[in-house]
Amino acid sequence: MIEELINKSKKIVIKIGSNTLSNDNGTINKNFLKELSEQIIYLRDKGKQFVIVSSGARIAGVSTLGKWMRKEDMNYKQALCAIGQVELMDAYRRCFEPYNVFIAQMLLTRDDFSDAHRRLNIRNTLFTLVDEGVIPIINENDTVSVEEIRIGDNDTLAALTTNIWNADLLILFSDIDGIYDKNPKEHEDAILVENVMNIDELLEKIEVGDVNEFGTGGIATKIEAAKAVNDYGIPMILANGKKENILLKLLEGTEKATIFQAGK
């Protein structure tokens, strides 16, 4: 089922969460990025188009300037993101450069999606970049985002991007295999929910936990993202980005994940 869904999808948004992107010590997992770029290039050669929504600016900032890691002042947090965003994009650039593929940075806030003119500019830029073979890499603009204009998490940003680009599929990479009936890190008997037809019914049957360690989104935000794209008729896959060659394994049907089916 997953392989069929990916096979028939041309326009794919991939969201990479902080926990997926980071090593256990909090640094950027550059091996993951290298592996991901190889898989994306392979699928691009088969006619697929990609937009990436990537967390990780703060992680990259901490890796670069660790002495600010424990500072709680918002100014320092935003400054870390400003430093880290440069490092993050450089890591992506280095991964795609051997294939002569360019990347483009897009930093957005909620205001950009709320204003019709800005929203149109986002859409036009996305279409232009992708049509010209460039891979857009999107993140929230943390350096200017205060509470009033924050999108809040990149699961939501990925859903907004998916809808505005009219994508065929959203894939969220996290550090778990999908949605479970209860937290698999705390319960060995947790059962993976592989196919979700009705999100409201799902919520009656599962336990929704808290936010993750590095990022701002937990299972609740992933379910909200699924609902947002499903309402536009777009399916979503939640999969474990920590697994080796996960994108190709999903395509081959050799890894399990959760599919949120779009309503008919």
Swiss-Prot record:
A GO-annotated cellular component: cytosol
What protein family is recorded?
Answer: Belongs to the glutamate 5-kinase family.
Name the pathway it acts in.
Amino-acid biosynthesis; L-proline biosynthesis; L-glutamate 5-semialdehyde from L-glutamate: step 1/2
Indicate the enzyme's highest-level EC class: transferase
What are the recorded GO MF terms, alphabetically?
ATP binding; glutamate 5-kinase activity
Q: What is its main location?
A: cytoplasm
- Provide the function of this protein: Catalyzes the transfer of a phosphate group to glutamate to form L-glutamate 5-phosphate.
Quote the catalytic activity from the record. L-glutamate + ATP = L-glutamyl 5-phosphate + ADP
Its recorded name reads Glutamate 5-kinase
Q: What is the lineage of its organism?
A: Bacteria, Bacillati, Bacillota, Clostridia, Peptostreptococcales
**Residues that coordinate or bind ATP:** K15, S174, D175, T216, G217, G218, I219, A220, T221, K222
Where is the protein situated, by its record's location annotation? Cytoplasm
Per its UniProt record, what Pfam families does this chain match?
AA_kinase
Kindly list the positions annotated as binding substrate: S55, D142, N154
Q: PROSITE patterns this protein is in?
A: GLUTAMATE_5_KINASE
Q: Read off the SUPFAM superfamilies from this record.
A: Carbamate kinase-like
**Which keywords label this protein?**
Amino-acid biosynthesis, ATP-binding, Cytoplasm, Kinase, Nucleotide-binding, Proline biosynthesis, Transferase
Q: What is its EC number?
A: 2.7.2.11
Q: Which GO terms describe its biological process?
A: L-proline biosynthetic process
